[in-house]
């Protein structure tokens, strides 16, 4: 049935439908959450994230794409179940991170750090470098153009990221360009400090 289908959706804002007979079908208050700018799981958040751990990243990505906040139970569940992301293919993770970083609000990537998602998707790699604090990285992401290489370099520049791009199954060209951009930025930081 339609209701059963909607019940299996990830978030309330995605659990609406339209019927010619009855109009909008909204059993899970998706319209209300849209109006309140909230990302909330349909039903029990832990169940939704257990069904598909990629939904954890999707919550953060929707938060960035729509500039919505994540409802408390949903946030607690995604924090608790972040280790399940280790079971998700690197390609699927790359796709969600790409959409997050290329969104209008890439600063929402801070949720990846505060919820413990980063060490799960980058195999324990949570070292913010001395040259660049998390806050600086987030500010630079917001100010940067929506360019794939630039945003990935900025995002990973705050991490000890040896091999991260390779582990996420990026092509060699992307890896090479991001590494060059990162090296250029590190050199510029050193030059600015010595000036």
Predicted feature descriptions by range:
Residues 1-195:
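Catalytic cores of the polymerase beta-like nucleotidyltransferase superfamily
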């Amino acid at each position: 049935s339609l209701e059963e289908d909607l019940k299996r959706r990830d978030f309330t804002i995605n659990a609406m439908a339209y019927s010619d007979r009855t109009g909008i079908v909204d059993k899970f208050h998706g319209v209300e959450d849209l109006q309140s700018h909230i990302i909330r799981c349909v039903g029990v958040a832990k169940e939704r994230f257990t069904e598909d751990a990629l939904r954890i990243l999707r919550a953060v990505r929707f938060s960035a794409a729509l500039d919505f906040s994540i409802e408390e139970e949903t946030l607690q569940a995604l924090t608790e179940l972040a280790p399940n992301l280790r079971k998700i293919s690197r390609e699927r993770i790359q796709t969600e991170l790409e959409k997050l970083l290329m969104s209008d609000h890439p600063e929402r990537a801070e949720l990846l750090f505060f919820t413990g998602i980063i060490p799960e998707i980058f195999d324990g790699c949570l070292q913010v470098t001395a040259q660049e604090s998390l806050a600086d990285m987030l500010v630079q992401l917001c100010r940067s153009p929506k360019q794939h290489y630039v945003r990935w370099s900025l995002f990973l520049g705050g991490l000890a990221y040896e091999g991260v791009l390779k582990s996420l199954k990026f092509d060699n060209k992307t890896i090479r360009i991001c590494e060059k951009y990162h090296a250029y930025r590190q050199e510029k930081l050193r030059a600015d400090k010595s000036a």
